[in-house]
A protein has these predicted regions:
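Membrane-embedded alpha-helical modules
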Residues: 65-170, 271-365
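Solvent-exposed, flexible loop/coil residues
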Residues: 53, 173, 178-183, 241-242, ...
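Alpha-helical membrane-protein architecture signal
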Residues: 132, 191, 226-230, 329
Length: 365
């Protein structure tokens, strides 16, 4: 969470959320995660763990031109409805599965690269903060890769405090949820809502199912997507983007460390849900705590946390010879940040990649 939350906060800033809307957004994510994990694990007796979409937050943070927070909420509602449709209409799920993995990975890599590069923009203004943290991340990742992002956050907070860059800390308080009526802006729906759905499905839900199946569980796809889609839809009006199946957290909860007996590992779900319910309760305080930290630190924490995912996505995108050109086209357009007809680069990157792939395969017939 230490590396993922700054990405969410970057997303809230990108769409112009107020402090109250930001607190509601973060708490809504906690509510959706807690409810999804609790319902799915208890009903299925499987360790089905939910999470918010970190790649989705990265997409929001890197999508320019969103006219208002309410327009972003409209995109969140659309993404949630599309997830529910995927649960109800099986051919739609098959269509998503037919998007080549290299194209999906290239779109994800382009989204993540923009946030990774953003941390280097703070080097000229805060070199004494950013550069030591980059060195710490490299060293920590070599010995304790799972704790590297947390180490950067903790060390960065201490370093920022010693440099006098930390604002006064907020008092502990409960979150007040704020309802937002969505605005239906066509460009935002197409440029943010559709890519958010695709990123959530391709980068979170499909790997989440793969982790569960690799651990010997056979979760029913439609009910799982229905629960996460419904949770996403309900909390979208609180300003929260999509929730989905977890992959990394699920790998922990589905392994022998959770319980020696695979049939009893589902118990991890309620405990996991309880933590996120507590997180939702004090979301405003958590947001206030992170808001007290300097932007350079948050950008560095987010960027270093995404380095591994970016490297993995780049490797998946460019590893195969057959689709490499199409993947490179998707990557280039997505990372460019270009906006056509008011629609963001992630959508156009996907379109260009699929177009290159279709032309290439047609000419090779």
């Amino acid at each position: 969470m230490g590396g993922a939350l700054p990405i969410v906060l970057a997303a809230t800033q990108a769409v112009g959320a107020t402090p109250e809307q930001t607190s509601s957004w973060v708490s809504g994510l906690g509510i959706a995660t807690a409810l999804s994990a609790l319902i799915l694990s208890v009903r299925s007796r499987m360790p089905i763990i939910a999470a918010w979409s970190t790649p989705g937050a990265a997409l929001i943070a890197s999508t320019p031109g969103v006219p208002s927070f309410a327009a972003a909420v409209g995109a969140f509602v659309l993404a949630a409805v599309l997830i529910l449709l995927t649960a109800a209409v099986r051919p739609l799920g098959r269509l998503i599965e037919k998007i080549p993995a290299s194209i999906a990975a290239a779109m994800l890599a382009g989204i993540l690269l923009r946030l990774v590069m953003a941390m280097f923009e703070h080097v000229p203004s805060a070199p004494l903060l950013v550069l030591p943290l980059l060195l710490l991340f490299v060293v920590a990742r070599a010995f304790l890769p799972t704790l590297a992002s947390l180490a950067v956050l903790v060390a960065g907070a201490l370093l920022a405090w010693s440099l006098g860059l930390v604002k006064p800390l907020p008092a502990l308080g409960l979150t007040t949820l704020e309802f937002t009526m969505p605005v239906w802006d066509v460009a935002t729906l197409v440029g943010l809502g559709v890519p958010l759905y695709l990123v959530t499905m391709a980068s979170q839900n499909l790997p989440g199912f793969a982790v569960l199946r690799a651990s010997g569980y056979q979760p029913p796809a439609s009910p799982v997507l229905a629960v996460t889609g419904a949770a996403s839809l309900g909390t979208a009006f609180l300003g929260s983007h999509t929730s989905n199946l977890a992959a990394i957290s699920a790998a922990i909860c589905t392994g022998p460390d959770a319980h020696p007996d695979p049939a009893k590992r589902w118990i991890a779900g309620p405990f996991y849900a309880a933590f996120w319910a507590l997180f939702a309760l004090f979301g405003a305080s958590v947001v206030g705590l992170f808001a007290a930290l300097p932007p350079a630190l948050l950008a560095t924490v987010a960027g270093t946390a995404l380095l591994g995912s970016t490297a993995g996505a780049l490797g998946s995108a460019l590893s195969g010879d057959q689709d490499r050109l199409a993947a490179a086209g998707t990557l280039a357009v997505t990372v460019s940040g270009v906006s056509l007809l008011g629609i963001g680069s992630a959508f156009w990157g996907l379109v260009i990649g699929l177009l290159i792939l279709a032309i290439d395969r047609f000419l090779k017939r």
